[in-house]
Amino acid sequence: MKLSQIFIGVSLGLVALSSSAELQDKNNNKKDIEVIKIKGSYFNNYQVDNASGAMRANVSLLETAQAVTVIPETIIDEQLATTLGEVLNNDASLSPGSKQRNREVFSSRGFELSSSTGYLRDGHQHWSHYQQPIETLSRVEVIKGPSSILYGQSAPGGLINMVTKQPTSTSLLEVSADTDQNGSTRFMLDAGGEIMADTNYRAVLVKQDVNFDREYQNGEKRERDRFLGSLIVEHQVSDNFIVNAYYDRTNDKAGLDTGAWLNADGDVISNEHTINDFSWAFTDITVENKGLKLTYFVNPEWQVKVGYNEQDFERQRFESSPKMPSNYQQGDSYSSNPYDRHDDWKFKTAFIDINGEVSFGGVEHNILIGANSLDYYYGQLRTSADSISYTPGQTEPMRPNVSYKTDTSLSTTEYDYYGIYFQDLMSFNERWQVAIGGRYDKQNKENADNESLLPKVGVLYHPAENSTIYVNYSEGFEPQAREHIDDVRDRNDGMKIDATTSKQIEIGAKWQVSNRLLLNAAIFDIEKSGTLISERLLDDPLFDTVTTQAGLQKHKGVELSAQGAITDKWFVITSVMYLDANYEEDAKYQGNTPVDAPEWSASLWSRYELTEQLALNAGIFYQGERFADNDNTVSKDSYSRVDVGATYQTRIMGKKVDLRLNVENLFDADYLAGGGINNVTIGDGATARFEVKTSF
């Protein structure tokens, strides 16, 4: 769709909505009755005062010695977000990476988040090798900096905690449908309420079909077909005991797009709308989560929570697997190495938290004692076909007749770990608080056992009731793939390898203005050490290499953010980050900057209420220049993307109806998002989306 068509459509839509709202106001004014206005009654949920994942306890953000961003459901709905990446755009500390193979990769403060250790769902470690079903979420918490003390192995940049919608005691039924200019559709049902006395439920159903802008070599469009079903039931056994059980299933099948290729100048080779994979390449994912959460209130001050979750993740991936040749130019031939592969991941997680408040020695203590565990299994079957040489413009090759089912050599990986943690938030008076904590962690894995002991300390000073100045020191760790160096031609063969560790010092300030706008500032210095460095030996007759744990990576930066209401009608969530990220000690990348770690990034999303029925949105998302390879030879230009939207609330046949129109990338800017030289994501052009939602 051309920009002019979108602009005209948006303009006409807004004029119509404004006229309708004005007419309704005039009609209302004719009624000679007293009207009491409640400002912000419909659009007032931008600010969140706490994050359950940051401290694993009911602690306000002003009492949390750590930078945390909470993106609420209101913003997720306003932006018509369908992927986690669209939600995380609202925090400048997160930069997008590759989207190849129908999943998303992100970096936090310049450190890539692992699919296995970078994501939580309701505090459970969550295997995130797919596009998360965000329709089940009530909010997304971005916990910044090393967080291993409470959750175990994790990246230095932080964690993403996805908090799910919970059962409601009051009746809830929302039905919505949205579509875009490419013909994509999404239908959603969100229901909740009371089943019987003391038993409530929440159910979500989603059916989505996506038509992408990019197409295959044979002219076929890439498509995606997704189904989501979720059910949570909660029963209050007694005044002190609550049982919560849940199940959800995601089926997600999509054609493969492993990303575009870049030349040495950072430009896309060939047509930016053409996919290098063949049209018969696909990924088919089925994910099931089932679990139980028990909450027991010992007394008004103390509670015990026990949680268990099983995640079964199965994926078939039939790849054409195109390979980018060296010095590739448009029209050159390239090879593809097809294969059919089946992956089976099983995540079994559990935790127990004992949390409460006690006072002794004139000090108030908010204490957390807990333990969590993970039982991990992975199995793979794979069968490969013969390599294919292809020149763009030729007829697309037929799909090879291979199947993973013919592979009889199942490749498996298994391990388990557990951790015990302690945390104490001590309040000495109205001005001073100190948070201390520690964790012992043990991993059991063949040839890769690992133990870690981690501290954490934070000091908070409150100049006033609504402000905080804090300093925080925390550590994190990520286990190595093996316990010892295993290479007879290496000088240090047999040397014990410790886990990769990270340390952070963060100084920050928080100020809650008029109980409706939260301002944050943070300065951080993160150091990741212990990565393996192998150096080649030229004149040693006995050994080829020497490997040490001398790797060092340093990321320093500043973050500023604001979230909440500026006036009764104007709401914002905005952030900016400056980042200086470098490999300080590395045999290959010494002094270089990691991929997709821009020096500057920023985000802004805002809403202005014209009337109680009509609100307008506008946002801008900026990513600075980024490197596309760790050698720092290819860079991607900076970009700014402008999004706009409008929501109109009315009643049809007595039912509340919300009409929403959004335009992403209003000015049709050309840009490259995340990914490297052979898997970069091309930003979508101007895209209009429309939603109708009704409540019963």
Regions found by a protein language model. Give the residues of each.
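Conserved C-terminal beta-signal and adjacent last beta-strands/turns
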Residues: D343, I367, V471, V595-F696
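Outer-membrane beta-barrel translocator/receptor signature
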Residues: E135-S138, I149-G229, V237-F241, E288
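Acidic, small-polar-rich N-terminal luminal/periplasmic segments of exported/outer-membrane proteins
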Residues: G13, K31-T170, I507
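Surface-exposed extracellular loop regions of Gram-negative outer-membrane beta-barrel proteins
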Residues: N251-D267, D375-G379, V459-E506, W511, ...
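Membrane-embedded beta-barrel scaffold of Gram-negative outer-membrane proteins
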Residues: K293-N309, F313-S321, H462, I469, ...
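Structural signature of Gram-negative outer-membrane beta-barrels, strongest in the C-terminal barrel
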Residues: Q236-N240, W345, E364-N366, N372-L374, ...
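Acidic/polar loop-and-plug regions of large Gram-negative outer-membrane beta-barrel proteins
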Residues: Q208-D213, G219-E223, F227-F297, E310-W345, ...
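Gram-negative outer-membrane beta-barrel transporters
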Residues: R431, D525-E527, T548-D631, F667-D670, ...
